[in-house]
């Protein structure tokens, strides 16, 4: 009697009277079963079966005893099953909803789902050895038409291997089913190499486009220029290709923008010894003097980094609920809905007209989070002057003091963004959305140097250092710890000013920000900045190609920090 390999045996007893078991057949792991009138026992030679292979007793207990005694001569390993509802008995049988699954190759009881099909331990090991050892079996003497069953599966190995492939066993599943650690590392290296090749292919495509444009321009050159030796022209073009010109120009412009707009970095280096940090708990006068826009202030030192620390002009009327902070250079910062944007005065008015007025109270201008522990209010953000705030101050005064110290840093981010090549070509709507969503991440990158991993200290903008333990005792929570961890990893890369400026631009210009209208334009600018960053990294670190990959992996970390920051602000309520 020939067994139908790959079937599933189901035992059904509707009454106490004797009845023959019905067999169901399944193709693969699909759960569609087809009834058949012929019974398919798991072991025809069992002592509990008659000459036709049918069980002597039809009750479920005796049949279960047949199955349990069937494979006692061949111990198998039990493992996890892949499908829900699938169980495995102590003898190695795989059951699905009470039905026993058979090996797709030989019809024996399947021990699990191996290499893409349900198979027994014998066929699983046979197929694995065949693939791993690349065994070439002897040719079949019966024209490769042998019937593979449990009793004769070892007679013709070529037909057995052919049957394994025909029922769906996968060669790749043998090679990559359970990947060792070294193999995974090797595959990751290959994937990174493939990514580099793909990027180089994209770069070559851009170079071809540049070459076509160059040929078009050369067609309009004078005849004498066209008659110059081709080799001489090629040598000149190799030295400075149009693509290289573009990348170098982007690198130079972004670097200059970063240096010119990151005033804290310059003043901290040049005037740290001249500037005196404010005392802890320093109060700001309640009666704010209105700032005279016509007055010229050209001070130096870290105090000048906060030009509106004692000067602020509040507008009323149509801008009620929005704080407009003016600066001597004719620019202003609009703080609305917790976001800070810096543009010219006319530009600020246009932007503010688009921002809803509702829900813009002082308590919603949350550019850092406050902690209320034991009745004492503390400000624990490095972008402020000090983590300490006088507990006698009202919530309004606390936010006012913080916004005064924090807003100029945001102003610098906006100035930096405006000087990124191509940023101002984006729509006004997309510029605002990129600044809203990315300002915190840019500041996180810029002020990463404030975190000292060795001393476990954080330097605030006032110049004072505080230990992490002290900040935690003041109420700093998981956000500050995550900021410290990120800064430690970023500082370990030891990026130059050029590399830091390009990375900051890449952080800001992200096409997956919410609310972007022209995604293609933002993506094009983002790709330009990423290519420039990669060129700079490869130039400065030819033997450390992983730095570029590590930098790109910092982008999701920054996004997580941004989300944590937003959650902290939304969860906190200022108590006046």
UniProtKB/Swiss-Prot annotation:
Gene3D superfamilies: Erythroid Transcription Factor GATA-1, subunit A (3.30.50.10), Retinoid X Receptor (1.10.565.10)
Disulphides: 334-340, 371-381
Major subcellular location class: nucleus
Post-translational modification: Deacetylated by HDAC1. Acetylation and deacetylation regulate its transcriptional regulatory activity.
Annotated Pfam families: Hormone_recep (PF00104), zf-C4 (PF00105)
DNA-binding region residue numbers: 100-176
Protein name in UniProt: Nuclear receptor subfamily 1 group D member 2
Induction: Activated by the CLOCK-BMAL1 heterodimer and DBP and repressed by CRY1.
Comp. bias regions, Low complexity: 13-47
Region (Disordered), start-end ranges: 13-90, 215-246, 263-282
A GO cellular component annotation in the UniProt record: cytoplasm
Gene expressing this chain: Nr1d2
Domain topic, free-text comment: Composed of three domains: a modulating N-terminal domain, a DNA-binding domain and a C-terminal ligand-binding domain.
Sequence positions that bind heme: 381, 565
Alphabetically ordered keywords of this record: Acetylation, Activator, Biological rhythms, Cytoplasm, Disulfide bond, DNA-binding, Heme, Iron, Metal-binding, Nucleus, Phosphoprotein, Receptor, Repressor, Transcription, Transcription regulation, Ubl conjugation, Zinc, Zinc-finger
InterPro entries cross-referenced by the UniProt entry: NHR-like_dom_sf, Nucl_hrmn_rcpt_lig-bd, Nuclear_hormone_rcpt_NR1, Nuclear_hrmn_rcpt, ThyrH_rcpt, Znf_hrmn_rcpt, Znf_NHR/GATA
GO biological process: circadian behavior; energy homeostasis; lipid homeostasis; negative regulation of DNA-templated transcription; negative regulation of inflammatory response; negative regulation of transcription by RNA polymerase II; positive regulation of DNA-templated transcription; regulation of circadian rhythm
Family, as annotated: Belongs to the nuclear hormone receptor family. NR1 subfamily.
Quaternary context: Binds DNA as a monomer or a homodimer. Interacts with NCOA5 coactivator, leading to a strong increase of transcription of target genes. Interacts (via N-terminus) with KAT5. Interacts (via C-terminus) with HDAC1. Interacts with ZNHIT1. Interacts with SIAH2.
Region (Modulating): 1-99
Function according to Swiss-Prot or TrEMBL: Transcriptional repressor which coordinates circadian rhythm and metabolic pathways in a heme-dependent manner. Integral component of the complex transcription machinery that governs circadian rhythmicity and forms a critical negative limb of the circadian clock by directly repressing the expression of core clock components BMAL1 and CLOCK. Also regulates genes involved in metabolic functions, including lipid metabolism and the inflammatory response. Acts as a receptor for heme which stimulates its interaction with the NCOR1/HDAC3 corepressor complex, enhancing transcriptional repression.
Tissue: Ubiquitous. Expressed abundantly in skeletal muscle and brown adipose tissue. Expressed during skeletal muscle myogenesis.
Subcellular location: Nucleus; Cytoplasm
Region annotation (Interaction with ZNHIT1) ranges: 394-576
């Amino acid at each position: 009697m020939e067994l139908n390999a790959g079937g599933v045996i189901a035992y059904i007893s509707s009454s106490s009277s004797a009845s023959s078991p019905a067999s169901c057949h399944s193709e693969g792991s699909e759960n569609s079963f087809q009834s058949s009138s012929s019974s398919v026992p798991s072991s025809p030679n069992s002592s509990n079966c008659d000459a036709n292979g049918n069980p002597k007793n039809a009750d479920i207990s005796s049949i279960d005893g047949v199955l349990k005694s069937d494979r006692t001569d061949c111990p198998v390993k039990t493992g996890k099953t892949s499908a829900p509802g699938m169980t495995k008995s102590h003898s190695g049988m795989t059951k699905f909803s009470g039905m026993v699954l058979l090996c797709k190759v030989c019809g024996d009881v399947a021990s699990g789902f191996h290499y893409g099909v349900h198979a027994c331990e014998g066929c699983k090991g046979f197929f694995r050895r065949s693939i791993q050892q690349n065994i070439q079996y002897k040719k079949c003497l019966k024209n490769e038409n042998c019937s593979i069953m449990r009793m004769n599966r070892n007679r013709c190995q070529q037909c057995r291997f052919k049957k394994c492939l025909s029922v769906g066993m996968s060669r790749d599943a043998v090679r990559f089913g359970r990947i060792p650690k070294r193999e995974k590392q090797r595959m990751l290296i290959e994937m990174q190499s493939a990514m580099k090749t793909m990027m180089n292919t994209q770069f070559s495509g851009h170079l071809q486009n540049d070459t076509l444009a160059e040929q078009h321009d050369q067609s309009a050159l004078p005849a004498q220029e066209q008659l110059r030796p081709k080799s001489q022209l090629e040598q000149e073009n190799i030295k400075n290709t149009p693509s290289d010109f573009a990348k170098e120009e982007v690198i130079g412009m972004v670097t200059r923008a970063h240096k010119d707009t990151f005033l804290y970095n310059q003043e901290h280096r040049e005037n740290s010894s001249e500037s005196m940090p404010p005392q802890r708990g320093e109060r700001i006068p309640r009666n704010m003097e209105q700032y005279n826009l016509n007055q010229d202030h050209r001070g130096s030192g870290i105090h000048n980094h906060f030009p509106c620390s004692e000067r602020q002009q509040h507008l009323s009327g149509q801008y009620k609920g929005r704080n407009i902070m003016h600066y001597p250079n004719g620019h202003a910062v609009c703080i609305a809905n917790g976001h800070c944007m810096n543009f010219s005065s006319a530009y600020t008015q246009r932007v503010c007209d688009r921002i809803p007025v509702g829900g813009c109270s002082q308590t919603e201008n949350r550019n850092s989070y406050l902690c209320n522990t034991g009745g004492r209010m503390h400000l624990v953000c490095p972008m402020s002057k000090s983590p300490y705030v006088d507990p006698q101050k009202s919530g309004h005064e606390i936010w006012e003091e913080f916004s005064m110290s924090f807003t100029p840093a945001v102003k610098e981010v906006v100035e930096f963004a405006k000087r990124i090549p191509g940023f101002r070509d984006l729509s006004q709507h997309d510029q605002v959305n990129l600044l809203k969503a990315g300002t915190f991440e840019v500041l996180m990158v810029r002020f990463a140097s404030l975190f000292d991993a060795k001393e476990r200290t954080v330097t605030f903008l006032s110049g004072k250092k505080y230990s992490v333990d002290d900040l935690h005792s003041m109420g700093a929570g998981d956000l500050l710890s995550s900021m410290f961890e990120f800064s430690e990893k970023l500082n370990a890369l030891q990026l130059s000013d050029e590399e830091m400026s390009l990375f900051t631009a890449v952080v800001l210009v992200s096409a997956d920000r919410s609310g972007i209208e022209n995604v293609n334009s933002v993506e094009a600018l983002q790709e330009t900045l990423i290519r420039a960053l990669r060129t700079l990294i490869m130039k400065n670190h030819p033997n450390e190609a992983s730095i570029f990959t590590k930098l790109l992996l910092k982008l999701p970390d920054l996004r997580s920090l941004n989300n944590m920051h937003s959650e902290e602000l939304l969860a906190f309520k200022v108590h006046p």
